[in-house]
């Protein structure tokens, strides 16, 4: 498996991320490998791991434009959120996944305010050329279709896939066709592009990954089948912020110039028609 041998795990390329199991107990310093000492013009930013590829690019652009230093960590959302909610970790800005987490941080006074950041989406993905002729979600239930799913992966990814199958009424037939149940979506994608399966369900952001984008095709899933809870990302200003003016400047950049970068990485901009619709539909507003 040459493709798999050449791959890197989704965590290896995240700036400042290490084993997430230690996060909740140990706080931010253990997840900040390569952490640079705080500077007066620095801003410490955490995001969930799914945003990391985009935020590395956003931070580079912001630093080049302003000269400010962004101390960035991207890691497992659940561990970071738990660390913050239990007061075992501190950061100045937090890109959180799920509106409920942002609301809980706000209610507890751990964050000062939040704004919509972006939205994710889920798609049906097939190897380039679509050898099995997959057309839609229903085709995953057809006899003989080899379905690869990341149900062993950490939530919200695995839970979202299960939710899509449940809402579409396809859980039983698709599970019967599942030939691979992976714990790592990157490893699963490596197998898919090598022809070890016919189709899978993934987050759209993964279709932009350099290792896959030229080796796959994808198609939309009807939004009515996609659970709403994991789609929302928010940008939170935390109570630990040292320079609120810098935090607001960074937030404004992420929500303006940064939106194009997020879209290139497979996310939905908060300024797009779909983004504006989801903000209203989900009530992504900081209301106290």
Positions of PLM-derived features:
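N-terminal secretory signal peptides
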Residues: 1-9, 21
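Internal alpha-helical transmembrane segments of multi-pass membrane proteins, especially GPCRs
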Residues: 15-18
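Hydrophobic h-region of N-terminal signal peptides that target proteins for export
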Residues: 22-27
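Periplasmic-binding protein-like
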Residues: 91-96
């Amino acid at each position: 498996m040459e493709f798999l041998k050449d791959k890197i795990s989704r965590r290896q390329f995240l700036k400042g991320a290490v084993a997430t199991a230690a996060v909740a107990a140990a706080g931010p310093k253990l997840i900040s490998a390569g952490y640079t000492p705080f500077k007066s013009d620095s801003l410490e930013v955490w995001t969930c791991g799914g945003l990391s590829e985009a935020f590395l690019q956003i931070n580079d652009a912001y630093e080049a434009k302003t000269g400010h230093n962004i101390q960035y960590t991207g890691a497992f959302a659940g561990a970071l959120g738990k660390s913050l909610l239990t007061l075992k970790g501190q950061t100045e800005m937090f890109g959180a996944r799920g509106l409920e987490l942002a609301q809980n941080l706000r209610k507890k006074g751990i964050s000062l305010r939040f704004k919509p950041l972006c939205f994710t989406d889920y798609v049906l993905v097939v190897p380039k050329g679509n050898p099995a002729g997959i057309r839609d979600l229903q085709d995953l239930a057809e006899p003989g279709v080899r379905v690869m799913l990341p149900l062993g992966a950490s939530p919200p990814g695995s839970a979202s896939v299960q939710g899509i199958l449940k809402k579409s009424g396809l859980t039983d037939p698709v599970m019967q066709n599942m030939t691979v149940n992976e714990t790592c979506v990157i490893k699963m994608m490596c197998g898919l592009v090598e022809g070890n399966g016919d189709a899978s369900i993934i987050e759209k952001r993964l279709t932009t990954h350099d290792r896959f984008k030229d080796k796959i095709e994808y198609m939309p899933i009807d939004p009515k089948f996609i659970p709403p809870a994991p789609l929302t990302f928010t940008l939170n200003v935390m109570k630990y912020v040292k320079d609120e003016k810098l935090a607001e400047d960074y937030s404004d950049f992420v929500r303006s110039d940064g939106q194009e970068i997020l879209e290139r990485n497979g996310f939905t901009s908060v300024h797009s028609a779909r983004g504006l619709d989801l903000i209203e539909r989900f009530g992504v507003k900081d209301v106290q």
